[in-house]
């Protein structure tokens, strides 16, 4: 288990915590932040947090940025909160490490 995410090697799934900032100038993953001793990946999203628009844009952005299928990305916690838990299916751990390490400064 990495301190930034929980990877299940038998199912090729990962749980990842996001700290989302809606109404941003651009869609951007910046780095990590610790909130209540829990690490979160910081994600700025252009969409407003109304009627699921920001949640939809989160899924679209992550799928495009990380070259994943939209159907393999699901928000499982925090639908109406800026702190979210994302489930990503069908992802290789080596590829996931490459993605995550690219945001660590």
Curated annotation (Swiss-Prot):
Transmembrane segments: none annotated. HAMAP family: UPF0235 (MF_00634). InterPro entries: DUF167, YggU-like_sf. Belongs to the UPF0235 family. GO terms for cellular component: cytoplasm. The lineage of its organism: Bacteria, Pseudomonadati, Pseudomonadota, Alphaproteobacteria, Rickettsiales. This is UPF0235 protein RF_1332.
